[in-house]
Design a protein with these regions (language model features):
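Outer-membrane beta-barrel initiation region
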Residues: 25, 47-52, 61-65
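Structured alpha-helical segments in the cores of large, soluble enzyme domains
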Residues: 53, 57-63, 315-318
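Outer-membrane beta-barrel strand-turn architecture
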Residues: 64-67, 99-103, 184-190, 253-257
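Periplasmic plug
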Residues: 71-73, 108-109
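Transmembrane beta-strand segments that form the barrel wall of outer-membrane beta-barrel proteins
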Residues: 74-80
Length: 318
């Protein structure tokens, strides 16, 4: 999958931007901007987008007899995002079984499970807002370039997020859901069905904030540090459970040789939902930079004096 020109947002180029910006400054009565060093013609969308690869693989087994049906499927998906370094993968398993024990009794179950590694997603917005007159990279300093004075307080070079902060979030999501049911026919016209369903999700993630330096001709030495200038690690863990039970009684009958049909259904449902989430973060200690190594991205490695934390939890039922 690739981003074609027709799919990109149409923006002005470097010379067109200068023309429009000059008009804005003149209308505001402001001094003209000094474009020295700002003569690039950067297409930021071309810089951040990539030709992406997608694969989906599935295999399944099915079986059936007059009294029994069975299904088992396993799948694997891998996707690269339109933005460089973004990638997503998922493994799934699905199973179902229905069995007719007697002419009046049927039981079955269904199960769906998944393990997902979400993408460390980045934004396109900065690439749409960043001025095209800014160069991407300064070869002399070996650093990405800060944006001009009129922009750098609001946004940074889009490549900072895409390249320097690539793969700084590691997350795992697990999901398991399913149901079991039993259905019985009795007294010729009645059917009673009971179903119990459960949905369980467990998500966890870690995010690393690196020290980011960019080339900025407006500062002494030409090197500027973005943000706090300290490394940081944050973590979260979230578990959610949903349980539901449904009970249905159905009456069906025909009258007048089938010219009139009657179906009546009554039932009730119970529902339970619980969630528990913990969040924590720590910055580096004095002179103790947290390594850019996922094996070290745990809050216990940071300075306890800088710790922040939070939590969310609830239980609900109907």
């Amino acid at each position: 999958m690739c981003i074609r020109d027709r799919d990109k947002v149409k923006l002005v180029n470097g010379s067109q931007f200068k023309e429009l910006y000059n008009e804005q400054l003149a209308n505001q009565g402001d001094d003209p901007f000094d474009y020295t060093g700002w003569d690039a013609n950067t297409d930021w969308q071309d810089e951040i987008f990539q030709t992406a690869f997608i694969t989906n693989n599935n295999i399944s087994i099915t079986g059936a007899s007059p009294k029994h049906s069975f299904y088992l499927g396993v799948g694997y998906s891998y996707e690269q995002g339109n933005i460089e370094h973004e990638k997503f993968s998922k493994v799934t398993i699905n199973a179902s079984n229905d069995y007719k024990i007697t002419d009046f009794l049927k039981v079955g179950f269904q199960f769906n499970g998944a393990r997902m590694l979400p993408a460390d997603s980045k934004q396109v917005l900065n690439a749409l807002r960043a001025t095209p007159i800014a160069p991407v990279y300064n070869n002399e300093y070996g650093l990405y370039t800060a944006l001009p004075e009129f922009q750098k307080a609001q946004i940074s070079n889009p490549m900072v997020d895409v390249e320097l902060k690539a793969n700084t979030t590691k997350a795992e999501n697990y999901r398991a859901s399913g149901n079991i049911y039993g259905e019985v026919d009795f007294l010729k016209h009645f059917t009673f069905k009971a179903m119990f369903s459960m949905d369980y999700a467990s998500n966890n993630g870690r995010t690393y904030t690196p020290i980011v330096k960019v080339y900025d001709a407006a500062v002494n030495g030409g090197i500027s540090t973005l943000g706090t200038g300290k490394t940081e690690v944050s973590q979260f863990k979230e578990n959610e459970t949903k349980v539901q039970s449904d009970y249905l009684l159905t009456y069906t009958n025909s009258f007048d040789n089938g010219n009139h049909n009657l179906t009546a259904t009554a039932g009730f449902t119970t529902y339970y939902n619980s969630l528990s989430r913990l969040d924590g973060a720590r910055k580096q200690g004095v002179g103790l930079v947290i390594p850019d190594n996922p094996d070290k991205w745990f809050v216990s490695i940071g300075d306890a004096a800088t710790a922040t934390n939070g939590s969310t939890q609830w239980e609900r039922s109907t």
